[in-house]
Structure formats: C-alpha cells, structure tokens
Amino acid sequence: MPKRTDIQKIMVIGSGPIIIGQAAEFDYAGTQACLSLKEEGYEVVLVNSNPATIMTDKEIADKVYIEPITLEFVTRILRKEGPDALLPTLGGQTGLNMAMELSKNGILDELGVELLGTKLSAIDQAEDRDLFKQLMEELEQPIPESEIVNTVEEAVAFAATIGYPVIVRPAFTLGGTGGGMCANEKELREITENGLKLSPVTQCLIERSIAGFKEIEYEVMRDSADNALVVCNMENFDPVGIHTGDSIVFAPAQTMSDYENQMLRDASLSIIRALKIEGGCNVQLALDPNSFKYYVIEVNPRVSRSSALASKATGYPIAKLAAKIAVGLTLDEVINPVTGSTYAMFEPALDYVVAKIPRFPFDKFEKGERRLGTQMKATGEVMAIGRNIEESLLKACRSLEIGVHHNEIPELAAVSDDALIEKVVKAQDDRLFYVSEAIRRGYTPEEIAELTKIDIFYLDKLLHIFEIEQELGAHPQDLEVLKTAKLNGFSDRKIAELWGTTDDQVRQLRLENKIVPVYKMVDTCAAEFDSETPYFYSTYGWENESIRSDKESVLVLGSGPIRIGQGVEFDYATVHSVKAIQAAGYEAIIMNSNPETVSTDFSVSDKLYFEPLTFEDVMNVIDLEQPKGVIVQFGGQTAINLAEPLAKAGVTILGTQVADLDRAEDRDLFEQALKELDIPQPPGQTATNEEEAALAARKIGFPVLVRPSYVLGGRAMEIVENEEDLRSYMRTAVKASPDHPVLVDSYIVGQECEVDAISDGKDVLIPGIMEHIERAGVHSGDSMAVYPPQTLSQKVQETIADYTKRLAIGLHCLGMMNIQFVIKDEKVYVIEVNPRASRTVPFLSKVTNIPMAQVATKLILGQSLSELGYQNGLYPESTRVHIKAPVFSFTKLAKVDSLLGPEMKSTGEVMGSDATLEKALYKAFEASYLHLPTFGNVVFTIADDAKEEALNLARRFQNIGYGILATEGTAAFFASHGLQAQPVGKIGDDDKDIPSFVRKGRIQAIINTVGTKRTADEDGEQIRRSAIEHGVPLFTALDTANAMLKVLESRSFVTEAI
C-alpha cells in the first residue's frame, strides 16, 4: 500500500529526560523516525523536553518544541499546530502515557487528531494487565497465573492461594518501577503498597513467580497489510527474575532448539497480529529449560531498549521502518537501507554473536542496593560483536569502563568461598565476575547451573576462557596459544599479565607475527547479498572487509556507555563533530561501544567501528585506517584518558595537545598556570596521605572541599567541616586514586557559574555564561542553570569573559573548553577547567543557536573563528530566559540518599524557556516532574546554619496560603521569630512523624537541609526516602525552594484585609 496522502502534518512525542529505564535509545529512535517521515515528505512537529539530544536539533523536524511533556503544554502545542496525526510509539513510556492521557481527556477527538502506528486499544491491551490477560487467553497463549489487585489485602489473599514466591508488577510504569519479587507476606505488603502508589491507575498484577526459566525476547515488526517478521531474537544470560534491562543479553539466542525457536516465534507473531500493531513490538517470553513449556511475560507495543539493541545488533533500522509503516507503507515496498538492494521483508540473518552488558551506577552510589530484581537499575549498556561467545563477552567486559579488562575483578581472589557463593546465588550487578571467579576456583558448570539457573552452555564458555588463561600461563610467548587467546577475545593486557610482561611487548609480538584483527561488516544478511553499510566489528580471522578509502580521514572517539556524570550530552557533541568533519571534506570515522545512541547509527558517519574504547582496540583501527588524526575532546573522560597513551604511540591528537590537557588536569601545573595568568582560585593544597591532608586543612581553615584529581562527575568529592571527618574521608575515599593525590581546597560558599568557550588559539568565542541557582557545593550537573545570568553584575561578567580568554590562550586550548567559577563579594575565583566539551554543550548550543561542537571541530581542522564569522569574546545574549534543570532516578535506586552535594547524582536534564525567569522556572519544574499544587502543607526540617534563611522562605509560603509544618528545633526557631509552625515529629513518632504524614498525603513539599557534618543524620535520610517513594517534591537546597517560590508567587494572588 503506498503511503498516505490524506495526512500532511505529523506530531511526534519524544521521551523527555533520561532516567533509568528510559535512556538514549529513544533519542536514537526518535531521531531516526523524524528524519524518516521528513524523507517521505511529511511536515513533522516534535515535542520533547530534553535539550541534550540530537532529536531536539532544529534540522531533525520542521518545528521543534522543547517544552514540558505534560497535558497542559502538549495540548497547547496541538491547538497551535493543528497536526493531522500523532505518533506516540517512539517516545518510550512517556510518549505512550501522554497519548493515553490526551485520548482520555478527549483532546484527540476534539481536535480530530489520529493516532498512528499503534491503536490506543492495542496500547491498552498490552499495558493494562487485565486486558492483556484476556487477550492471551483468547489466543491460547500461556501466561503465569495472576490476579489484578487494587489493595494490599487483595494481594495477600491471592498469594495465599498460589503460594510464594510471587512477582508484583504495577500497571503503566516504566522499567519495572515499584515492582519486585516477594518471598513472603511481609515483603508482599511492603512492595504492593509502594507499587499501588506508583501506578497511575492504582493497580498491580500479582503473579506466580517463574524465576529460573530462560528469558527470551523477540523483536517483531508488522505492517498494515499484516506482513510480519522477526527482526531478531535475544536470550538473557540471567534467567527470569532479573529485569531484561539489567541482564546480560546475547543475540541471536544461543541455547534454544529449532523447535523451541519456531514455537516462540509463532507465539510472538500471533501476538503482534492480534494486537494489530503497525510498527515495532517487543515480546518477552519465559521458557522452561526442562520441557517445551513457555509463558508470555509481557509485550511492549512500541520501540524499546531492546529494539535499539536489535537494530544495532542486526543493522536492521527498526525505528526508521516503524515510522514508514505508520504512514501506510508496507514492508514489501520499503528497501532495507543496509543492503540497498533487498526489501525490508527479509528477516535479518546473523553470522556473528552480539553481547550486551548493562552499565550500573554503583561506582557512584556505594550505599545503593545492588541486588538485582524486576526493577531496572542500570543507567546504560555496552554492546560487543564477535565470532563466538567468548570473544563478544570479553570485548563487552572491557567496554564497560569499570576498571576491568577481562571477565575478572582481581580483588575477588581474596573473597571467602561462602561469601563468593552467596554473591553467585543472589544476583548483583557484578555477578558475572563472581561466577567467573567460582569457575577459576574449580566449581563445575553443573554446580553453578544448579545454584543460579544460568544455562550450562554459558558456564561452559566461562570455563573455556579459564582453560585458555591456564594455557597462556603455562606457555609464555607461545604464538599458537596467543592466536587461540585472541580468537576468543582476550586483551593484550590480560595476556601480558599471564606472561608477566607488558601490554606493549604483547602488541609488538603480535605485529611482528601478523596476528592482527580483521574487520567484518554488519550487513543484516550473513553476507548473502552485497551490502553497502560501512559498519564494522573486529575479530581474529580471515578476510578483512573494511577497505581503506583514498580520502583523508579523521577518527572521533565516542564516550562509551551512559553513566551518571557522562550522559547523552557527549554523544550529541560526537555526532555534531562528525558533521563538521564531513563538511570539511574528510572521511569521518566513529568508534564507540554504546548501542543506544545516535553516534552508533551507521548512517551518521562514513565508517562506524563498534568496538571497546581501549588503547589496544583504538590502535588496531588506527593501524588499519591511518587517519590524519584523532579527536578526543567530545568523548568525555573516556576519550580524554586515551589521549596520552595514543600520543605516546605516535598518534596525532587533533585539538588541545596532551601537555596542555595535563596542565588543566594536574593540580600543581594548573596552579602554576593560574599564577602566571594572574587569575585567583580558592586557596588549596595537595596531599598524598592522611597527615598531609590534616596539615593542609589546618593551614587553609575549615570547611574544606576534598577530592581526588582526574575524575568526572565529582566522584568521591566531599565537603568536610572538621579534622575528624577529614581523617575518616582520607581512610575511606583515597582508594579512588592510589597514585593520584587528593586535593584539599578552601570551600567558598558563593554564587557558582560556568562557561563553555571555543578557541582557535588566537581568538576565544564565549557563547554564554550560565548561572547556577544552587550555591557552590552542589555539583554543576545537579544544579539548575540559568542563561542569560540574572544576578551577575556587568563587572563580574566582564571579569569572567576576561579570565576565560586568558585561560583559553594561556592553556593553548584548541577547540572546546569548560570553566567553572565561584563568585563571592564581587570577586571571581576559578574552581576548575576542563579542556574538552562539557555536558552543557547541547543546552547552550540550542539557546544561542551556535552549533558549538561543529564550530570547535572546524577550528581543530584549521579554520579560524573570524573565517567562520564569529567575534572574539562574549556572544550577545538571548532575550528569552532558558533554564536547564536536572532529573534524578532515585525511585529506582533504593538506599541512595537524595541529598545533593559535590558528587553528581542526576541521570538526565530538561529545559524550560520563556520570556521571564518565573515562567521559564515553572516550565523547568513541570518538565522535571516537580509539580507543586497551589495550596497545602510544606514541612521544614533545617540545619542550624540555614534557619535564618529558611524563616524568610516559610513566611513567603505562608503569605500565599500554604500551611507550615516544622520539626522541633526548626519550629522553636520560627516561633521565636513570630512564625507559628505546626510541630511534627522527625522519625519514630508513631503516626505523627513526617513519613506517616507523607503516607497519608498530608504533605505537599519537604524542605530539608543538613549541616556539612559527615555523619549526615539518619533521620533526614529516612525523611528524604519517604518523599522520593511517595513522589512528594523534596528540596535539599534552599536556593531551589526559593526558585519554586518565585514561580508560585508569580502564579498566585495575595489576599489581604484592608
């Protein structure tokens, strides 16, 4: 059927900020879909609140609205734009839920807007647990016995009839939020109570646990002519019971017989046909390893994390084709863009194995609950491609960037057998490494399979890896063993370790004996047809398929898996850099390991290498491609850390040179540079041990800020008030960098702001100054930032511009740099300089209309700012006010304290823009899901040093009609200043403490600050946790609460008697 001509204008809803469970895969899907619709000649209107994505770039859609994805704003845009149709299936759960809400409120009918792709009835049938159950019964597809409950008592009664363990799944939540496995009634009560609160329709499904079955996924496509196909099946290494987003996954599935595959394939296709889904869909199934019994677990009627993985694993562009199907095209009339000759009706065939391993945030959250279950906890993932399981698994391990280069963590050798087996049985994020250690200790695959329900096939592969380790150890320098190890994915570094030599010597030995990788193409058809995709992976075998072109090339290093502190913003800069390289006439090559992102879409660059970002893997590509140089400044800390070893190996680093990168990162060199340039910084010293640190702090005076050098995202950074806290920090945190010293700085409480600058070595362009709403001490990634600045005097802004120019020229910066300042009493101090693209690049690029990463790349390749038409100095500021606000994923991470401090905790960001500060703030709060009703109660529980300031806020809340509650000390302070607050107990006051008030819905906001003491109060932590779990707005910085007040005051009227 040809495409529809009765619709011209289509609105696409994006997925909003990045949170755990909904990450960059939707940026990738949404970007693909918008471009695919434009390609067919439709006018595309996009709504998304996330500035950090490629999707919200002007050229992706005809009109881009960076506005909150809420009923109020989406309706407003629908009325203004009047589209013919709405495509909600590419915006993750956010897009789907928004479509449901628009429909339920009658907006779609009123405006005559048609839903494309998946009908509402199908979304309902797949998402509503009751309707799903009915449909499966009609199709005679088996599902675990289950019951829908709306109260805790109903859940307990049903569990009594089927027996424990049971699984709780709240309806309409994302990434398993609020769900979990319950072994007994106590756990069931706790999880169901929380689940009912988090479900927008207050319902949960209680089902028999099928933990221990194999978890298999099918990624399927269907069009309006009822053509349907399987793009790819995937098998979880971990059995059912661990969220698929937190599982190691292999594609294609490895342990199923042909009969089982056909059985599950037929089930998946019959489900997508019954739901009449037009587009992509993901079916999750559980297969009994001991019989042909299976259950359908769930269906996602939309593009999902798994479809991004399936797209990258097969090269089959699901989102692009889903968009074409949504406008009426069928699979037998669309050409598969990979081969350029076959139709999209051909099911992909793979002649390689893909491994995906999730990336968890527990290196940032040491206190976090690491046990894995049905609720997702990973922030990102890596993918690796190989010719066998061993190769793809080991390549994926070294892609993770958690300090391992093999499937082993050396410290585990010291763990006792009992502790080891406990970690093997109770899965945590690092279970793979414990299982591998158990095999090294001689536990058999049979024993481990019995304990873990992991298929013995995979455990045999881990055993094979261990056998190769023993071979290597027994035969140093043996070329045959070396070849075997390389065929199975071993890194040079691991081989060097076993041989007691250096990585470099192993590399030399390989090169001398021509043991080098070949690069194979990902072509969707197992090389049956000719293919034109320049998408490659390395393996040690025959016939290299990646042919070097005659054109001069530039290699750009990506930023690897998404984690806290290094998010999609760096991918954004990478993609823009590639555009500029191509515009300058070079061939652009990307190397990256993250399957979720736009940079690993093969249509972005001239060549894509899907490889780990390690020195060895990068050098192999450089040896083959011989690029003009490598650009490292857009790949975050991942790429910057590779600059030095690459330069030592004789590779040309384009942009700021390694010696200058060092001057910005190395404390003593940096201090030296600032002295020479006559720029003040807070007084500080370096220390290599506890005594030195104590001495330094006495000299500088408390409070001090302590942190290791060379880290991203403020890892292990703390503000300490006294010597005892400092000593305890030195004992617990210095692990963070054994051969790097710790920095001890005077902690200045002042106004913080940051600048991104672009320099060509002579001139410096400063697109804008961003002012932080939270005072110094909150990590810049967790602060709300405002552009243009609202409170900085002209003099301060001029000083900032002057210091920025001096630093850029003085540090010989070529390309991007980011500088953070703190201002106290009109005096400007430099806190830190990062000689690379920072996480504010996409935000600032969008609000100033300067494509910063592209400009920086052009300068790196030799053009000057004046040639590109930019002035030296501060760019004229915008007339509108723009705010970047952080978004957190605390609901997913039990036991992580939500108190903001110098260590970064946010996973994503949103933007709010309007004519005034108050309106922009309102949008930013709405977009980041911080919604305050116009009346209700606010609780204050405040540290002594901030009571004075809090009193002023409480008065303002009272003036606009809020009730004020406060804990004992705070209430007494308020009363002594003439403000009566209703006293409320902290913790353990039966039903009069804050958590129980929160549970009863009597509190609308909590304002809680703590002193800077290291023994942060346990009570405070429980109060903050209860706010997070019940979705009550929580402010741990008074500045944020003050910003919220500005919004409320601007939206309310004051009523006073005359």
UniProtKB/Swiss-Prot annotation:
Binding site for Mn(2+) 4: 832, 834
Residues reported in the UniProt entry to bind Mg(2+) 3: 820, 832
Binding site for Mn(2+) 2: 298, 300
Chain positions recorded as ATP 2 binding sites: 707, 746, 748, 752, 777-780, 820, 832
SMART domains associated with the record: CPSase_L_D3, GARS_A, MGS
Pfam families given in the database record: CPSase_L_D2, CPSase_L_D3, MGS
Keyword annotations from UniProtKB, A to Z: Amino-acid biosynthesis, Arginine biosynthesis, ATP-binding, Ligase, Magnesium, Manganese, Metal-binding, Nucleotide-binding, Pyrimidine biosynthesis, Repeat
One GO cellular component term: cytoplasm
Renumbered residue ranges of the record's region Carbamoyl phosphate synthetic domain: 547-929
Alphabetical GO biological process terms: 'de novo' UMP biosynthetic process; glutamine metabolic process; L-arginine biosynthetic process
UniProt cross-references to SUPFAM superfamilies, sorted A to Z: Carbamoyl phosphate synthetase, large subunit connection domain (SSF48108), Glutathione synthetase ATP-binding domain-like (SSF56059), Methylglyoxal synthase-like (SSF52335), PreATP-grasp domain (SSF52440)
Sequence segments annotated as region (Carboxyphosphate synthetic domain): 1-401
Amino acids binding ATP 1: 129, 169, 175-176, 208, 210, 215, 241-243, 284, 298
Co-factor binding details: Binds 4 Mg(2+) or Mn(2+) ions per subunit.
MGS-like domain location: 930-1058
Region (Oligomerization domain) residue spans: 402-546
Binding, Mg(2+) 4: 832, 834
UniProt keyword annotation of Mitochondrion present: no
Family of the protein in this entry: Belongs to the CarB family.
Protein name: Carbamoyl phosphate synthase large chain
Species for this entry: Streptococcus pneumoniae (strain 70585)
Gene that produces this protein: carB
